Structures are given as structure tokens and as C-alpha cells.
């Protein structure tokens, strides 16, 4: 197991032109430990790749520090940082065999031929690619080319592995296979890995922890479950998974929880509270307005009028392991998504129905918006 520690401290990157100044990364703080598989997730232009490039030494830092095992990375070139990198473009040499592509970095490092042979054969065995050693990149599938790029990044035993959208050029089924392969290899080697993607399912499936970025800012860091179940902003709740939103009015403070009323009079007792204005933490009081967020699996549909919120079922989608109901509800900001592990008897497209909310899993966002 790796004992390395990467610390990113108040990291910022500003791009300046004659007429413009753009902050791509704004005061980001991160700490990544040992053999973590850590993912930086966010929409295009959010700053995740720029952060990765600064860690790699491919982008000049405007301000802040990057420390690896206490050493200031700013004092080392990309080559000296001992980092393995895999990018969206595999950048394989078409005139070199798989073996020669993997060995290329070792030749640059002036490693002996005997050691090169041992190291390359070992990494090809680990990636189950030994039989491809004499083939050329144009003769390989996309997944095989990706494995070659990974082998080349790992063969010299780097201190950390950086992966920037490495599966973007693969089809959907192969992406799933390769992300599991990357996760297996990473855990087998016990190497710290930092993975950049905009694909939330990809991030959730492979990460020990993930960081959600938006507009250059770090919005939240946590395990996939923490970020999904306890989002700390409306942006994170919307970007990670599907979310439903209901305008609410706070009517009573009750210990650590609150009582809220939705627009049609439904009362809820909630204990999961998020203050959106960080200057007002703990100041929630009656008569404030807020937004209740509920995941689709924590809603239920019923033909009974007593369930709570009235709605009309617009669309029913059977998605294999669950059935998704898309309903129109005047109490919600948008269409409401309800996920059920099995089809609900008596509910059809066009049906009138009622929505029930699982209160322990609902979150109240209050004081402003994000």
C-alpha cells in the first residue's frame, strides 16, 4: 500500500489576455492519501483538468502550493515528479510494437535493457497483454490501445497515476469494462490515482472519494455515497444523480430539525438541513423559505388521495432494475421523477396519483441559492 500524501493548498490558476482575465481554478484545497482512487468530477470548463495539469507540472500555478510527501512540486519539472499520465489521446507510436511503446519511457530514463525487459513483461502480464507484445497500435482495438497507454504510464513505478478523461474515445460498453479494469489495476498496484471525468456514473463507480468542481471552485469532497446522499449545495445535488425540488416554507424550529410546509399544505419534519449562505450557518428560523430536495428512490406513488401531493403521470419508463415515473406536480419546480423497484399497480400514463415523501431522506436547502 502506498504511504504517499498529496496536498493541494489554496491552488489558483488565472488566465490573462490583453482584454480579459479568467479564473479557471479558484483557491482549491485537497488532500489525497495513500492508494486512494480520487476523482475530480464536474462539467466542461469547471477547472478539474486545469487542476490536474498543475499537479502534473503541465500548467504554471498562479498561486498556491502542491506538496507531495512534503516536497514542493513547484521545484520539480514534470519529468522529475515521477508521475504516470494517461490522457484522452493515447499518443502511441504507430511504428513501434506494444512492447516498444511500453518500454519507451524506460529508454528515456536510460534503464538497462535487462531491467526494461523485466519491467515491461511484468506490467504486460498484470494487464493481461503479453500475447499482444509484438503487435502494432493500428492493429489493436480501442480498449487494447488504452491498456497499452496505461501500461506505459505504470511501467516505471510512478508515485502517482493521473488519468484525464481516459475513456472518452471508447463506446459505452467498453467504457464500463475499461473503468473496472483501471480500478482493478490501481488496487492491485496500490498506487495513488487521480482521475478526471465529467461522467458522474464513471466517477461514482470507481472512486474511493471524489471532488465536485463548478466554475473553478471546489464544491464538495467525499465518498460517492456522501456526495450523493448529503450534497452540500444545490449544484452538487443536481449534478450528482437525479433530484427533485419542492419549494417550502419553514414554519417551526424543532431541536435539530425543522417543520416545513409545501405549497399545497403538506407538512414535513426534516432533520437534514443545508445552509446555502455560509455566512448564516445555524441561523435558520421560522418564516424563511427554502427548497426541499428528494432523490427519485425516496418518493412513492399511490392512487390514494391521502398520500400527499397530487400529480399526473406523464411518462413511464421500464429501465430494467427499476421503473421510472415522470410526473407533473404543481408543487415542484420541474417535472418529478419517481423510481420504483417494480411497476406500481394501478398507475398508468395519464393517471392521477399522489406523491409520498420519505422524510428522513429529504434535505432542506435554505438561505439563498447556489
Spans of model-derived segments:
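The feature captures the beta-strand-to-loop junction immediately N-terminal to the Walker
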Residues: 41-43
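Helix-to-loop junction immediately C-terminal to a conserved catalytic motif
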Residues: 56
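ABC ATPase nucleotide-binding domains
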Residues: 76, 80-238
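ABC-family P-loop ATPase nucleotide-binding domain
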Residues: 1-14, 305, 368-370
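Non-catalytic connector elements of ABC transporters
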Residues: 243, 253-370
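Conserved ABC transporter NBD signature motif
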Residues: 64-72
Amino acid at each position: 500500500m502506498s504511504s504517499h500524501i498529496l496536498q493541494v493548498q489554496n491552488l489558483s490558476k488565472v488566465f490573462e489576455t490583453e482584454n480579459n482575465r479568467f479564473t479557471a481554478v479558484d483557491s482549491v484545497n485537497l488532500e489525497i492519501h495513500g492508494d486512494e482512487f480520487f476523482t475530480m468530477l464536474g462539467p466542461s470548463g469547471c477547472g478539474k483538468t486545469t487542476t490536474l495539469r498543475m499537479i502534473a507540472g503541465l500548467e504554471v500555478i498562479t498561486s498556491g502550493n502542491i506538496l507531495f510527501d512534503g516536497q514542493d512540486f513547484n521545484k520539480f519539472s514534470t519529468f522529475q515528479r515521477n508521475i504516470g499520465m494517461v490522457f484522452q489521446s493515447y499518443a502511441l507510436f504507430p511504428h513501434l510494437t506494444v512492447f516498444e511503446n511500453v518500454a519507451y519511457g524506460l529508454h528515456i530514463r536510460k534503464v538497462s535493457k535487462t531491467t526494461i525487459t523485466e519491467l515491461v513483461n511484468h506490467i504486460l502480464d498484470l494487464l493481461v497483454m503479453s500475447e499482444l507484445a509484438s503487435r502494432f497500435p493500428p492493429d489493436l482495438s480501442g480498449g487494447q490501445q488504452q491498456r497499452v497507454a496505461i501500461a506505459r504510464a505504470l511501467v516505471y513505478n510512478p508515485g502517482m497515476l493521473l488519468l484525464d478523461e481516459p475513456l472518452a474515445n471508447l463506446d459505452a460498453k467498453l467504457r464500463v469494462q475499461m473503468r473496472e479494469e483501471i480500478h482493478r489495476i490501481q488496487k492491485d498496484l496500490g498506487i495513488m490515482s487521480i482521475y478526471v471525468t465529467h461522467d458522474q456514473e464513471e466517477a461514482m463507480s470507481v472512486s474511493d472519494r471524489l471532488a465536485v468542481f463548478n466554475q473553478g471552485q471546489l464544491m464538495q469532497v467525499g465518498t460517492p455515497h456522501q456526495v450523493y446522499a448529503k450534497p452540500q449545495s444545490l449544484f452538487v445535488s443536481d449534478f450528482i444523480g437525479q433530484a427533485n425540488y419542492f419549494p417550502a416554507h419553514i414554519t417551526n424550529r424543532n431541536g435539530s430539525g425543522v417543520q416545513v410546509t409545501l405549497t399545497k399544505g403538506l407538512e414535513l419534519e426534516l432533520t437534514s438541513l443545508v445552509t446555502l449562505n455560509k455566512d448564516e450557518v445555524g441561523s435558520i428560523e421560522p418564516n424563511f423559505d427554502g427548497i426541499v430536495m428528494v432523490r427519485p428512490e425516496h418518493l412513492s406513488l399511490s392512487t390514494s388521495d391521502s398520500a400527499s401531493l397530487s400529480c399526473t403521470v406523464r411518462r413511464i419508463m421500464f429501465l430494467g432494475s427499476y421503473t421510472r415515473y415522470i410526473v407533473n406536480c404543481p408543487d415542484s419546480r420541474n417535472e418529478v421523477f419517481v423510481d420504483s423497484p417494480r411497476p406500481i399497480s394501478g398507475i398508468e400514463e395519464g393517471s392521477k396519483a399522489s406523491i409520498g415523501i420519505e422524510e428522513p431522506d429529504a434535505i432542506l436547502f435554505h438561505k439563498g441559492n447556489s
